[in-house]
Amino acid sequence: MDPKERIKELREKINYHNYRYYVLDQPEISDYEYDMLMRELIELEEKYPELKTPDSPSQRVGGEPLKEFEPFTHVVPMLSLANAFSEGELRDFDRRVREAVGDVEYVVELKIDGLSVELIYEKGIFTVGSTRGDGIVGENVTQNLKTIKSIPLRLKDDVSLVVRGEVFMPRASFEKLNEEREKLGESLFANPRNAAAGSLRQLDPKVTAKRDLDIFIFNLQKIEGRKFKTHIETLEFLNEQGFKIIPIHKKCSNIDEVIKEIEEIRNLRDKLPYDIDGAVVKVNDLEKREILGQTAKDPRWAIAFKYPAERKKTKVLDIIVQVGRTGALTPTAILEPVAISGSVVSRATLHNEDYIKEKDIRIGDTVIVQKAGEIIPEVVEVVKEERTGQEREFVMPDRCPECGALAVRLLGEAIRRCTGLNCPAQLLRGIIHFASKDAMDIEGLGPAIINQLLSKGLIHNIADLYYLKYEDLIQLERMGDKSVKNLLNAIEESKTRDLDRLLFGLGINLIGSKAAQVIAEHFKTMDNIMKAKFEDFTQLPDIGPKMARSIVSFFAEKQNVEIIEKLKNAGVNMKKLSKGKVSNIFEGKTFVLTGALESYTREEATRMIEERGGKVTNSVSKKTDYVLVGKDPGSKLKKAQELGIKIIDEKQFEEMLKGENI
């Protein structure tokens, strides 16, 4: 068969099966058969690149990472909806509508708790997708939206239209994603809506493609060459074109039927596989919508009814303290199990010790618990009239319950944090940070390998990395002879890193790379840093009382001193390497870097400037002398041009390093 014809046939087959699987949930072929069709299409398109088109289903896998999202002005403003929280407010809305246009039919729909987007199709082909933004201008996230398989890349008809929909993440996918993030020591998403928003706004579409996002289309914003009388007709048309439309859209003759349907949706809420935060009421007649019009913020023909967060009464059986991956100690209430929003709740967050004091929460109290989309519900109120006198006050520990290290609460902060390098709760994240590029830069030591090392008991702290042997690493998954030797060489090479890189790698709370440089430059050795007192640190530039307290508390912890000693015994450098200034050619000069540099990393360019007496800052101001511009610069370039700051490229920078054209 002619390649062009075969590609056309494969696209039609894949689009058909995508629709059966992702929209109708009625697959006709196995995953393997589908994968074979997709593989053949990709191979043919690679062989004949001139036949590749933007609407091909092969384009869903995700393109190249973006530097930033481009702003996009919506074809039709994406207005928000006015809210109603009671039956009375719904009846007020109905009265206003009927006063303006007479009796009306309404449509009641689910209000999906996700991220609103606009999709534009030209002659049946998906061309642009954007987030809501401020309602007038959003962000162009077309490449990311193409990875959502329930969004058709080509419609049934060659029609030009604009639709609005809600991108969301099903609860099961959300739970799976958080499980994976927890294993990698990454921060958890608070709820499916946050996960959906974070996933859609990834600069790398390949990340979005892995996140299992879905969409429901709920409104036809604009269409060329066709007319419809009602909202229901538009939904039926969109369904025929291949869109996954909002699953519940009930036509109601009057406000009483609307209120009844909203209550039915409330009862259904917990059984749905995705989150909703209410119901939307819309006028069905499109001509009457035109008459009703809109305010600057919202249409007069629609309103959102928001369900209140469900609250239940239960008892606090105990209060325990959990340690997060950043070392934060969080008090958690152990509750008498109670059913809320479709799940049995047996624990609730108490946030921090101030929250407990403010609410006067005690062990044994009867409390009101609320679940409002968070992973863990929260205690919102104490029923003090039910106290018996047997309740016990809770005292926040000053030692970490996981490792016994000192738990420090810095002045002005609500959170108490563990200072222990050995703390199992924060070990994965701590080692990932220690091995990162700006710290010890151990090439090849990523989260997956660190996870294996920890789970097999081969390491228990950062110092153990320097005692790993060939036979330890060769047993790990995906580690062959060459990769083991490369990793051992990378670990060995990291021993020579400068003192500030090691200090930053320890992950001391509030001590970033810049502060680590200031401290290392002043004290010269790790021993001097460990012996220094609070006031010794506060005298340094850019080191405030909180940072000083944090670093003093860190080195007051015995287990941390032992790990430093272990690092020292392994041969890790503990001194500020005396590089000295290469020259003073940039003395008194301030630089700003913007865009991706080709010849060096930002860190390398920064060091080159500082070694020659210059200073690097993050923002452009009148005090800036030079802006070094790389590929795809951001807004800093524009500001530099407006202020008349000298702009240099890498070639000019290299000439300046030689002492030329300064």
Swiss-Prot record:
<dbReference type="InterPro" id="IPR001679">
    <property type="entry name" value="DNA_ligase"/>
</dbReference>
<dbReference type="InterPro" id="IPR010994">
    <property type="entry name" value="RuvA_2-like"/>
</dbReference>
<dbReference type="GO" id="GO:0046872">
    <property type="term" value="F:metal ion binding"/>
</dbReference>
<keyword id="KW-0464">Manganese</keyword>
<feature type="binding site">
    <location>
        <position position="403"/>
    </location>
    <ligand>
        <name>Zn(2+)</name>
    </ligand>
</feature>
<dbReference type="InterPro" id="IPR003583">
    <property type="entry name" value="Hlx-hairpin-Hlx_DNA-bd_motif"/>
</dbReference>
<feature type="binding site">
    <location>
        <position position="306"/>
    </location>
    <ligand>
        <name>NAD(+)</name>
    </ligand>
</feature>
<dbReference type="InterPro" id="IPR004149">
    <property type="entry name" value="Znf_DNAligase_C4"/>
</dbReference>
<dbReference type="GO" id="GO:0003911">
    <property type="term" value="F:DNA ligase (NAD+) activity"/>
</dbReference>
<keyword id="KW-0436">Ligase</keyword>
<feature type="binding site">
    <location>
        <position position="166"/>
    </location>
    <ligand>
        <name>NAD(+)</name>
    </ligand>
</feature>
<dbReference type="InterPro" id="IPR036420">
    <property type="entry name" value="BRCT_dom_sf"/>
</dbReference>
<feature type="binding site">
    <location>
        <position position="418"/>
    </location>
    <ligand>
        <name>Zn(2+)</name>
    </ligand>
</feature>
<dbReference type="GO" id="GO:0005829">
    <property type="term" value="C:cytosol"/>
</dbReference>
<dbReference type="Pfam" id="PF12826">
    <property type="entry name" value="HHH_2"/>
</dbReference>
<dbReference type="InterPro" id="IPR013839">
    <property type="entry name" value="DNAligase_adenylation"/>
</dbReference>
<feature type="binding site">
    <location>
        <position position="400"/>
    </location>
    <ligand>
        <name>Zn(2+)</name>
    </ligand>
</feature>
<dbReference type="InterPro" id="IPR041663">
    <property type="entry name" value="DisA/LigA_HHH"/>
</dbReference>
<dbReference type="Pfam" id="PF03120">
    <property type="entry name" value="DNA_ligase_OB"/>
</dbReference>
<dbReference type="Pfam" id="PF14520">
    <property type="entry name" value="HHH_5"/>
</dbReference>
<comment type="similarity">
    <text>Belongs to the NAD-dependent DNA ligase family. LigA subfamily.</text>
</comment>
<keyword id="KW-0235">DNA replication</keyword>
<protein>
    <recommendedName>
        <fullName>DNA ligase</fullName>
        <ecNumber>6.5.1.2</ecNumber>
    </recommendedName>
</protein>
<dbReference type="InterPro" id="IPR012340">
    <property type="entry name" value="NA-bd_OB-fold"/>
</dbReference>
<keyword id="KW-0227">DNA damage</keyword>
<feature type="active site" description="N6-AMP-lysine intermediate">
    <location>
        <position position="111"/>
    </location>
</feature>
<dbReference type="InterPro" id="IPR033136">
    <property type="entry name" value="DNA_ligase_CS"/>
</dbReference>
<dbReference type="Pfam" id="PF01653">
    <property type="entry name" value="DNA_ligase_aden"/>
</dbReference>
<comment type="function">
    <text>DNA ligase that catalyzes the formation of phosphodiester linkages between 5'-phosphoryl and 3'-hydroxyl groups in double-stranded DNA using NAD as a coenzyme and as the energy source for the reaction. It is essential for DNA replication and repair of damaged DNA.</text>
</comment>
<feature type="binding site">
    <location>
        <begin position="31"/>
        <end position="35"/>
    </location>
    <ligand>
        <name>NAD(+)</name>
    </ligand>
</feature>
<dbReference type="GO" id="GO:0006281">
    <property type="term" value="P:DNA repair"/>
</dbReference>
<feature type="binding site">
    <location>
        <position position="109"/>
    </location>
    <ligand>
        <name>NAD(+)</name>
    </ligand>
</feature>
<dbReference type="Pfam" id="PF03119">
    <property type="entry name" value="DNA_ligase_ZBD"/>
</dbReference>
<feature type="binding site">
    <location>
        <position position="132"/>
    </location>
    <ligand>
        <name>NAD(+)</name>
    </ligand>
</feature>
<dbReference type="Pfam" id="PF22745">
    <property type="entry name" value="Nlig-Ia"/>
</dbReference>
<keyword id="KW-0479">Metal-binding</keyword>
<dbReference type="InterPro" id="IPR013840">
    <property type="entry name" value="DNAligase_N"/>
</dbReference>
<dbReference type="GO" id="GO:0006260">
    <property type="term" value="P:DNA replication"/>
</dbReference>
<keyword id="KW-0460">Magnesium</keyword>
<keyword id="KW-0862">Zinc</keyword>
<keyword id="KW-0234">DNA repair</keyword>
<dbReference type="InterPro" id="IPR018239">
    <property type="entry name" value="DNA_ligase_AS"/>
</dbReference>
